[in-house]
UniProtKB/Swiss-Prot annotation:
It comes from the Eukaryota. GO terms for molecular function: ribosome binding; rRNA binding; translation initiation factor activity. It is found in: Plastid, Chloroplast. This is Translation initiation factor IF-1, chloroplastic. The gene is infA. PROSITE patterns: S1_IF1_TYPE (PS50832). It comes from Jasminum nudiflorum. Keywords: Chloroplast, Initiation factor, Plastid, Protein biosynthesis, RNA-binding, rRNA-binding.
Length: 89
């Protein structure tokens, strides 16, 4: 059997949504690529929206297109500090 080729996995930010599950992704290195949703994400009905951080798999042959393989969880929202500690009685 033929060995599968290793692919690059990079992270980026979804900047635009296009029809048919295509997205414009701004990679962390500054490059912009066109990403499409992988089959597992499509089957599990995971929503990808503008502003989401994703992992995208790029081939060595075409660095302008890639497959979105994972949507990263959003960063935790910091809790506001309690005002009870600051009040003077």
């Amino acid at each position: 059997m033929k060995e599968k080729e290793a692919k690059w996995v990079v992270e980026g930010l979804v900047t635009e949504g296009h029809p048919s599950g295509m997205f414009r992704v701004q990679l962390d290195n500054g490059a912009r690529v066109l990403g499409y949703i992988s089959g597992k994400i499509r089957r599990k009905a995971i929503r990808i929206m503008q502003g989401d951080r994703v992992q995208i798999e790029l081939s060595h042959y075409d660095l302008t297109k890639g497959r979105i393989i994972y949507r990263l969880p959003p960063p935790p929202i910091p809790k506001p500090k309690d005002s009870e500690d600051d009040s003077e009685d």
